[in-house]
Amino acid sequence: RFDSAMLMKDLPRASGDHYRILDCGMKSFPIEALSHAPLTAMMKCVKENGIKPGDVAEIKVEVIARAADILGDPHKYRPDSKETADHSLPYCMAVGLVDGMVTPLQFKEERVLDKSLIPVMDKVKVVANEEFEKLFPKFQPSQVTISTTAGKSFTKRVDVPKGDPRDPMTAEEIGVKFHALGDSVIGKAACDRLSAAILGMEKIGNVRELTALTVRA
């Protein structure tokens, strides 16, 4: 028997109450789910320490065993399609390091097949960390250690990926993703207008004002 009262259980009843919809995760990268935490760790490590692509000698990636098996097998070091590349930890780490971002643009055929990324992919070493198994799936622990050509070493660990409600994307990061998805469809200017409308949706008097912005000129 369907319990209709369940639909109302624990719903916010005052303006200061917390809405669970705000706890939804958002994929910050268009890649396989288990790749998000290690890529987050690397991007943070690079930014925090001012690491340049040419400075990197090795990127050691510690993840749970299933992530290492699925995302770091030998074939993933030579992706030949978008479908392989977005499930390849070596590719995602390499293109993220070189391009400074991982968006749909990084999975266009010409980028996936770009041979200049091969030496960078070969610097990525994916290993399983048994200690991380105890924390999964509540957490998705990943640790990245970047060794530089100057002999320095930088380590960053994250337990949740960027986009998890415990480490939410910023408005700027959401904007980058939005434009990466929409610019080629409706154009940058239209994307700017649509983004502003969505972020200010509570000010819109009629939903037609919003839907009109989704029509290609």
Residue ranges and their predicted role:
Residues R1-A217:
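Terminal-appendage/accessory-domain detector
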